[in-house]
Amino acid sequence: MLHAVNGSRFTVAVSLLLGPLMTAPVSASTMATLRPQALQCLQAGQDAACRSALLVAETLQRRAAARNAFPCQTLLLGLQADLIMQQLGEGRGDQAVADVGATSRGCAGL
């Protein structure tokens, strides 16, 4: 479970949004798995795709951190923020979609 920093509303919001996902099983968590789910979320606003993409992105960003692949981890954290904002109805549109491609390129081989 994510740990909240005192006074951080964003951390609390992320904990509430991701908390239920932390117990869901994740099969092959790869960028190839994440990309179509993230695009479905960002382009079509499909809530199930958003939840699934968040779970895969969380697994991948932890893997990136464990490998000291910090630029990739940063891209994945940004993508997670885009997915959460989409769920909240405040998505960044075309820029968020473009960021999926940037994340795929920046995390190739993860």
PLM regions with names:
Residues 27-110:
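Post-signal/leader-peptide non-cytosolic segments of secretory proteins
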